[in-house]
Amino acid sequence: MGIDPAYGSSAFGIVVTEWADGLVQILYAEEYHRPDYSEMLSLVYDLMSKYQVDKVYVDGANPSFIKSLKLQIGEEADYDKVIARYRSEGYGDDAALKDMKVVPVNFNKEHKAMLGHCKMILENEGGRIAINPDRFDKLITSLRTAVDNDGTLDKESTSYNDIFDAFRLALKFYHFQESSDCNSY
């Protein structure tokens, strides 16, 4: 699951995926404008339960939503302390994040890598994404209008850019090898 929480005038994007039949299949993709914070927290929790979500990647620019979601599922809310504890024990950030169900993602650091990863999944071997066009038209529109400017998404040119960001976050779960196998964590 990938979540781009709303702040300012942006929308709240949610994308849920699963690996089935050799493809990343979209189970849920929606964008909400000016949503109620509590309603979004409840919706995300319900989607996590309904789809038995293993990992939730959330834009780290909204720490209050991340902490609220972590509290709701019984995970340590102060994720900065968790990461610091792993560091003090000689483990890296990756070990701490691997043990988390709700994972904060620093878009400033990772946006280019996530865009490249997204392009690779969409383009390699004819694409590895299955999207129902009758259910997820906003996601399809966002993918069709996405513009890559030297590894950075041109948000002005991209329709539904918040659902696109949630899609990129959801794809962090998948790691492909040359043999078409998918490893996920």
What do the predicted segments below correspond to?
Residues A11, I66, K172:
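Active-site-proximal flexible loops/turns
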Residues P5-Y7, G60, I163:
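Generic detector of well-ordered alpha-helical packing
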Residues A20-T152:
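Mg2+-dependent endonuclease catalytic cores in nucleic-acid-processing enzymes, primarily RNase H-like
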Residues L171-Y185:
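Acidic two-metal-ion nuclease catalytic site recognized across multiple nuclease folds
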Residues M1-E31:
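Conserved helicase/translocase motor-coupling segment
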Residues S9, E39, N161:
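Conserved active-site and cofactor/substrate-binding residues in soluble primary-metabolism enzymes
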Residues T152-Y160:
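Short, flexible active-site recognition loops that position polar ligands and cofactors
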